[in-house]
Amino acid sequence: MRFAVLFLSISVPATAQTGTLTIYSILHAVGEERYQIEPSEGALKLSTTFEYTDRGNKRTTTADLKMTGDYTPLSLEIQGRPTDVHVQAGSATVKEDTAARTFATPEKYFAIFGPSPFAVQMMLIRYWNAHGRPAHLPILRARADATPLEIELVGHDSIAVRGAMVTLDRYTIANLMFGREILWMNSNGDLAAAMTFAGGLPMEAVRTEYQSAFPQLYRSGVSQELRNLQAIGKLAPPKRTGSFAIVGARMVDATGNPPVNDSVVIVRDGRIAAAGARASITIPNDMAIVDAKGQTLLPGLWEMHIHASGVEFGPALLASG
């Protein structure tokens, strides 16, 4: 599937651009972000302030991102976190907490440390579109093994704003944090909305003038996450589907009873139909057998108070046991 996107010229704007985003946590408005993009010494400068209240605690982060006219980062300074990036003559110096590194910049790159402030992500998408939409985009980090970002244009959404229809481009971003974020951009290259996570809990941002469409965008984002989950499932398909018996494992059933050393678990259409000692379970003659001798089996799920904020958390937690 191919998508067409229209963007304005990437020349340096003659006047300042401003915007305000309303910040949500678990669908409750908790703060806002205010940003300004203006010419600065022949280049661009983004200044943004991100403020929100979390359980009575007010948190403020400010960022200054300087870029060339094609959105290539020259420096990024974030107050509220001990992080900064400076690029000069093809060399980048990055400081994160107590770590620091100086290295040659790749051919294409961006400077960003996490989901917020959201205006930095807006400039990330502008850079990505202006530089040929690379499949893997390196980010300047103190860690040499930082995973490149994977950005995809995955669809479009149309929303009604003051009686007019506005078409937004929907993106996913992987490797900025665990899982994939979802972002929407308008035709001017402005951030319309974003869905991400903070502290294991959902966090959203929406352009203030688009607030009336937030419920629609949120539903679209959830649908996109389910499509992301389907794609993950294809990467690691189950070894067995339908009906089968898992035989011979040491079963721990979380009831407080001693483990069952020679167990049988009957699965029918993805659900556990029976589980217990081999002597107590009858295996149908025509049922496929999975030999689990020497392994430990935990049938079902244990609730251990996890924050499964994104669809990627489920497969990752299952894979880790």
What is the role of each PLM region?
Residues 2-13:
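Bacterial N-terminal signal peptides
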Residues 16-22, 40-47, 68-77, 90-93, ...:
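Short, hydrophobic/aromatic-rich segments at coil-to-beta transitions
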Residues 30, 82-168, 215-225:
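Solvent-exposed helix/loop surface patches that form functional interfaces
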Residues 35-70:
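N-terminal, post-signal-peptide region of Sec/Tat-exported proteins
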Residues 56-122, 177-188, 192-204:
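Contiguous hydrophobic, core-forming segments of folded domains
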Residues 205-248, 282-283:
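Extracellular/periplasmic ectodomains of large secreted or surface enzymes and adhesion receptors
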Residues 257-298:
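Histidine-rich, glycine-flanked metal-binding segment
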Residues 287, 293-321:
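Metal-associated gating/positioning segment near the N- to mid-region
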